[in-house]
Every structure is written in C-alpha cells, then in structure tokens.
Design a protein with these regions (language model features):
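Surface-exposed loop/interface segments of Gram-negative outer-membrane beta-barrel transport/assembly proteins
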Residues: 1, 39-137, 153-167
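Residues embedded in well-ordered regular secondary structure
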Residues: 1-44, 82-83, 122-126, 143-145
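Membrane-embedded beta-strand positions in outer-membrane beta-barrel channels/transporters
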Residues: 14-16, 52-54, 137-139, 143
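Residue-level signature of outer-membrane beta-barrel architecture
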Residues: 21-23, 57-61, 142-144, 148, ...
Length: 167
C-alpha cells in the first residue's frame, strides 16, 4: 500500500516542570515546558518544537486582591508544502510501481490516471514551509471588596503574537 511509502514512525516528547507556593497573603506559580514532535511524513526533517513559560502571582491586602499572569510560547515548525499528501497517495492505483521513483533517471514517476502528483516526490523534493512563532499573553486584574457581597473588579490584558513563515 502506498501509504507505507510516505508515512513513518515518529517520536513525540513533552516535558513540563512547575513550582508553586506562597504564604498567607500571596501565592505564586511558575512553569516551563518543552514539546518536540517529529513528523510522520517521509522527507526532510519536518516537525514541531515548542518552548513555553508561564507565571502567576496573586496577592491580597485587606480588601484588595491583585493577580498578574504572564505566559510566553516560542514555536518552530517545518511542514510539507502539499496539503493533499495523504489524499493523493490514496488515489494512486495499486498496479503502479510500489515505489514511485525511477532509480535509473533519478526522477519520481507521476500518477497520470487521477492526479499529476507523486506524494513521495513532493515530500522528499517538493520544498517545505518553515514557521517561527512567538506568543505573549499578559493579564493584570485588581479586585476591591466594597461591602460584603459587592466587589469591583478591573482587568487589563494583552495578547501579542509574531508569526513568521518561510519557504
């Protein structure tokens, strides 16, 4: 089956660490993580890596409570340029060569019956999209207890992101 030619076993790793604590009026949490996913597609080193960091702190003094949250994520990924790799592989007739590659000419054979695509050729030689993305999320909130059962709360937040794509 042609899917065996374009798919492979891939490793996924995910690591996280966090520290939390506090006292009578203040609590905190800090966490960091790393994620690495190799691609299941044959070809160059497709995959995704992500680093993330998060911190929360809350403090209370008399009738006032303040909370600050900050998170950051950096991601690198490399993907195939063909969005129909699996669909094109499933369209290849079974009577075609098992491996759609001619070692004599060094060329990939085309499936001219249903599509002019060769999924393996596109994965190995068709180029790639490379992404570098950064995300920041920040929130600050303040809460004042006016009377029993009535609180006033204000929230200020920002989402900042920078997405970069290269081919």
């Amino acid at each position: 089956f042609y899917m065996d030619e374009i798919l492979r076993t891939a490793m996924q790793q995910n690591y996280n660490v966090s520290v939390s604590g506090g006292g009578a009026n203040t609590t905190y949490m800090i966490s960091a993580g790393y994620y690495d996913q190799e691609s299941n597609f044959e070809g160059p080193d497709y995959g995704r890596q992500r680093y993330n960091f998060r911190t929360n702190i809350t403090t209370e003094y008399k009738r006032v409570k303040v909370t600050a949250l900050l998170s950051y994520s950096h991601e690198n990924s490399k993907t195939t340029t063909d969005g129909s790799t699996i669909a094109n592989a499933m369209r290849i007739p079974t009577y075609y060569y098992y491996r759609q590659y001619d070692p004599v000419t060094g060329k990939y054979l085309l499936n001219d019956k249903l599509t002019d695509r060769n999924s393996l050729g596109l994965l190995e030689e068709g180029g790639y999209n490379k992404y570098r993305n950064d995300y920041v999320n920040a929130n600050l909130s303040a809460e004042v207890k006016i009377i029993d059962g009535l609180k006033l709360r204000g929230v200020l937040g920002a989402d900042i992101f920078a997405d970069h794509r290269y081919t």
